[in-house]
A protein has these predicted regions:
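Alpha-helical recognition segments enriched in aromatics with Gly/Pro capping
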Residues: 1-88, 93, 100, 202-213
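Alpha-helical hairpin
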Residues: 2, 152-155, 225
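Residue-level detector of well-ordered alpha-helical segments, enriched
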Residues: 30, 77, 94, 112-119, ...
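Charged substrate- and nucleic-acid-binding regions of tRNA-handling and nucleotidyl-transfer enzymes
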Residues: 180-228
Length: 228
């Protein structure tokens, strides 16, 4: 197995072992599935499949499917495959794996960790990515106001500040503090101000997270953080 077209994988060169991958938050099932397809391809009706259980691999393995050429270990492909396995986990199974990681960065007892897990699961590639994705929940990070400038959302520093000033009293008076209730109120505000929804929602998303990339949208984050 090669790390690139010229070099074999080697622990000495910093290439990951199975144990390293598991510590990083890859799932055993994903690693086994990926490694099984390195230098070997299934035949017949399974030729186009990419996902197999260990039992299925044992049943369909045929030595004739082994390639004579060296296989290249593509970590990006493994990340993609692991993300697909993450999505397939039941909410309970994902939470069991994610909870220990989430507890290292979220210490506020008022935060529902199961709700956090449900929000991040569809976007989680490996478990070790989670701390960076959710660290804003405990403490808003320092961030550049340039995050409010977003071409696709049509936001500028000026209209973002204006939107936030309009948003605050709406949130303060909102009684139904759910994702749906928040979204309905903010979309109504955008319509009242004759603005695109994004001109209201993007500034709020930045204001509550301090990040350009978050595990959910503005209303999902607000619902998670709670009104207080």
């Amino acid at each position: 197995v090669m790390c690139d077209a010229q070099h074999k994988m080697s622990k000495r060169n910093g290439d990951p072992s199975y144990e390293d991958l598991i510590r990083e938050g890859y799932l055993t099932e994903a690693v086994l599935n990926y490694v099984a397809l390195l230098g070997w391809s299934p035949k017949g009706e399974n030729a186009e499949r990419e996902f197999f259980t260990l039992q299925e691999l044992a049943e369909i393995f045929d030595i004739s499917g082994i390639s004579k050429s060296p296989a290249v270990f593509d970590l990006d492909k493994l990340r993609w495959m692991n993300a697909e396995y993450m999505k397939k986990l039941s909410p309970e199974a994902f939470f069991a794996k994610a909870e220990p990681v989430l507890k290292t960065v979220i210490t506020n007892p008022a935060i529902d960790l199961k709700a956090v897990a449900a929000l991040v699961q569809p976007r989680c590639e490996i478990l070790s990515d989670l701390p960076e994705r959710v660290d804003f929940i405990d403490r808003l990070p320092e961030y550049s106001t340039e995050l409010y400038v977003h071409k696709k959302s049509k936001t500028t520093l000026e209209n973002s500040l204006s939107s936030l000033r309009e948003i605050l009293p709406v949130l303060e008076s909102l009684e139904v503090w759910t994702n749906e209730g928040l979204y309905e109120a903010l979309v109504a505000l955008a319509a009242k101000l004759e603005l695109k929804n994004s001109v209201v929602l993007w500034p709020l998303r930045v204001a509550v997270s301090g990040k350009a990339s978050t595990p959910g949208g503005a209303t999902e984050l607000c619902a998670l953080l709670g009104k207080e």
